[in-house]
Structures are given as C-alpha cells and as structure tokens.
Design a protein with these regions (language model features):
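Membrane-water interface segments at the C-terminal ends of transmembrane alpha-helices
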Residues: 22-28, 58, 66-69, 134-164, ...
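An internal, D/E-rich "acidic patch" concept
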Residues: 57-113
Length: 313
C-alpha cells in the first residue's frame, strides 16, 4: 500500500516536471509569436504591445504559475492564432483522438490476446510458423503506409468509404464508427503483431517453470493449467507492454489523422507548431503526457492485482 502511494506521488511529480519542461521549451526556442502573427515588417511598438497583450513581457515563473493554476481549472489560455480559448479547441478535437485511440486499443486486445494464446499452445506448428511470418511483415510496415494502402483499396477501388469525408459521431454514429475503423486498423495491425509476439514468448517462458509440472502432476489438463495459472503470470509483462502501446497509439495517431483527414489532436498539434501557437502546443503536450503517466499507473495497479507479491511491498 505504501508503495502504491509512493507510485501515485511519483506520478504527480512527473506531471509537474513535464508541465514545467513543456512550458520552458517554448520560451527558449527561437522565434517570437508576436512577430509570427504581425509579420517581420511590424514596428517594434506594435510587437511590444502585442507581447504585452499576450503576457509575454511578464517573468517566466509568474507566467508558469498562472498557467498551471489555470490548467488545473481547465483553462489553458487563449490561442494566439484563433483568438479563442484553448479548452474550447480541445473540446472539439479530444473526442476524435479519443475515439480513434479507443477503437485501436479494442482491436489490439480483441485480436492479440486470442492469437497470442493460440500460437503459444501450438508453438512450433505450421500455423505458429505462419503467424510468426505474418507478424514479422506487419511489424515492418509503418502504420501510415498501411493507412495509405487501406485508403486506396477500400476507399478508391472498392469504395467502402469516402476518403477524407469525415463523419462526426454526433451526426451519424454508425457512419462515424465505420469511417474510424480504417484508421484504427492502420494503427492496430503492427501493434497486434508485437503484442502477439510478446504474449507468446511470455506464455512459453511460464510453461517451463516448476509450478506447471506441479499442476500437471495434480491431474490438471494443459488447458486448465494454462488458463488458471500460466496466463495470469504471463500477463504481467504484457500489461506493461500494452500500457506503452496505449501511450504510443496517441503518438501514432498524429500521422494517421493526416492520412485520413481526421480533425483530432494530431492535426491541431502540427498546425499549432507551424504557427508557433504555444498555448495550444503546451496544452496538447501536457494532455498527452498525462495520458502516458495515467496508463502506466493503471498498468502498475493491474499488475498488482495479478501478482500478489507486489501487494505485499
């Protein structure tokens, strides 16, 4: 219990450090947002006035503390480019990236767990060798290449969906889920292959341990031993890997959103970086960092349930 509390404390400390570094990074990189907005021909007086309006003339720590206090209340400031609250912009983009991330992760779980168990139970067989070969191919193909291929085959050739014709869940939930399926598959395929490989290796490693032979000596079948004992122990490293995968999906969605013209956080982030719209970029970076830290904390708590030894620490 003490270790769990320490873990949560470290999580909060990590968020503070990440927020500070994110805020600091955009203060030291070359370029002035005021000059970017007004142009290089603007007079020094106009630039100074805009910097004061944007709060860039105040001390760094004062601006950071004010930004953190605002962020805790859901106020990430005002966009330099669009002159609107960043929180309002996020409200329109987060559901898109959230739905894409959720669908991708569901696909990963739905296919990788059964396939990992299947290949481990039939290790060395023809199907296992075939799956290993397919996994190697899937892991070698970048998600954006898969996305382009899916767009060409299912969008342009078979016309199962209209490329670039984003459908909002609020307007048509069924049509939206169908459109999101293709970018979700693009993200999920290489990660399914990696998770299958990880789970297969973990199960095969557990099958070599003494408790498996003890279970067999008590009359338990291979199937019963696998599902009652082996799988629980084998899932520890897989859960940690899935946590990293859940975090990686958000990063991978940046390119996929471009390929499928999805109005999510990824596209907004790229546009904001190009425009030096620091409040938007800072907010996205902190939100992504929070997601990464959160899924790793959840992975630890799940592993604590799977492994009683962690609960005793």
């Amino acid at each position: 219990m003490k270790y769990a509390a320490k873990k949560i404390g470290l999580t909060l400390l990590t968020m503070v450090i990440v927020s500070f570094l994110a805020f600091l990074a955009f203060q030291v990189i070359p370029g002035d947002p005021a000059v970017k907005l007004l142009g290089t021909e603007a007079t020094p007086e106009r630039i100074a006035a805009l910097r004061a309006e944007m709060g860039l003339d105040r001390p760094f720590l004062e601006r950071y503390v004010q930004w953190v206090l605002g962020a805790l209340k859901g106020d990430f400031g005002t966009s330099y480019s669009y002159k609107m609250p960043v929180s309002s912009m996020l409200a329109g983009k987060l559901p898109v990236t959230g739905l894409l991330t959720g669908m991708s992760f569901v696909l990963i779980l739905a296919f990788s767990i059964p396939l990992g168990i299947f290949t481990a139970r039939h290790a060395g067989g023809r199907l296992d060798r075939a799956m290993t070969a397919v996994n190697q191919v899937l892991m070698a193909i970048p998600a954006f290449v898969t996305g382009i291929l899916l767009t060409y085959v299912f969008g342009l050739v078979l016309r199962w969906f209209v490329p670039g014709n984003y459908v909002s869940p609020g307007d048509n939930l069924g049509g939206s889920l169908w459109y999101f399926l293709f970018p979700a598959v693009s993200i999920a395929l290489p990660r399914v292959a990696m998770t299958v490989k990880m789970l297969r290796s973990s199960i095969l490693s557990e099958l070599q341990k003494d408790y498996v032979r003890t279970s067999h000596s008590r009359g338990n079948s291979d199937r019963a031993t696998l599902y009652r004992h082996v799988l629980r122990n084998a899932m520890g490293p897989v859960v940690s890997f899935l946590a990293m995968t859940a975090a990686d999906i958000v990063a991978g969605s940046v390119v996929i959103e471009q390929v499928f013209s999805l109005p999510g956080l990824g596209r907004m982030l790229l546009t904001s970086i190009a425009n030096r719209d620091y409040p938007v970029v800072q907010a996205v970076v902190v939100i992504v960092a929070f997601w990464v830290v959160l899924v790793n904390l959840l992975a630890y708590l799940i592993n604590q349930r799977l492994d009683p030894r962690l609960r005793l620490q």
